[in-house]
Swiss-Prot record:
It comes from Burkholderia orbicola (strain MC0-3). PANTHER family: UPF0502 PROTEIN YCEH. Belongs to the UPF0502 family. HAMAP family: UPF0502. This is UPF0502 protein Bcenmc03_4618. It comes from the Bacteria. InterPro entries: DUF480, WH-like_DNA-bd_sf, WH_DNA-bd_sf.
Length: 236
């Protein structure tokens, strides 16, 4: 899937720190989810970095730490500071610096915020940033990001028993694939992706509720017939 003709030429970048990567992810996310408060103040940006939901890993950083990271990102032109407000506000410049379209920015943002994801998880979790028609369109953009001269994502080894490969961003440097292969192997053949695990839990609850309903029905019918279903059967 080719980028549009007016996509800016990408620049070579140094590896980012985890906090710098988190800041970029938060700025893109909030640009789409709370546009009325974007660009973000330092307070809002710090709160977004420390958010407990939709974050992996969860961070606990101070405004001073965020300010230091912002200064570095401004030097890389990845973040710009607005001057039209008494309160300093910050916005990202990822599209222009990285030279990638908004669809790819959406996918990269989810990886920056949530860690490794399958293409299916990326499609689901990026819905508020961009609506992808299907998983194949997600994979097409991921393949482009992985094929760049300076790759931005990588496909991780498939975990035993998993149906899909996960993807991870490379904004913080290269990934030791052996670490992921050994970690995945340690999960065993019974390991499943988070999305499948949640579906299995929901199905287990549904079945448990159904069993409880049927048990109540049996008890009611037995009571009407005068049968003691709890009595032990005759030994013969």
């Amino acid at each position: 899937m080719n980028t549009t003709p007016d996509t800016p030429t990408p620049r070579a970048l140094r590896e980012l720190t985890p906090l710098e990567a988190r800041i970029l992810g938060v700025l893109v996310e909030k640009q789409h989810t709370v546009p009325d408060t974007y660009p973000l103040s330092l307070n809002a940006l710090t709160a977004g970095c420390n958010q407990k939901t939709a974050r992996s890993p969860v961070m606990n950083v101070s405004e001073d730490e965020v300010t230091t990271a912002l200064d570095e990102l401004k030097r890389l032109s990845l973040v710009m500071e607005g001057s039209s407000s008494r309160v300093p506000r910050f916005e990202h410049n990822m599209n222009r610096v990285l030279g990638i379209p908004s669809q790819a920015i959406a996918l990269l943002t989810i990886l920056l915020l949530r860690g490794p994801q399958t293409a299916a998880e990326l499609r689901l979790n990026s819905a508020r940033l961009h609506g992808f028609a299907d998983i194949s369109s997600v994979e097409a953009f991921l393949d482009e990001l992985a094929a760049r001269a300076q790759p931005l994502v990588v496909r991780l080894p498939r975990a035993p028993g998993a149906r899909e490969n996960r993807w991870m961003h490379l904004m913080c440097g290269e990934v030791n694939m052996a670490d992921f292969a050994s970690a995945d192997a340690g999960g065993g053949a019974d390991s499943v992706p988070p999305s499948e695990f949640e579906a299995l839990k929901a199905e287990q609850k549904r079945l448990a509720d159904e069993v409880a309903r049927l048990n109540a029905l049996v008890q009611r019918m037995a009571s009407e017939l005068g049968i003691d279903v709890d009595a032990p059967g005759d030994a013969s």
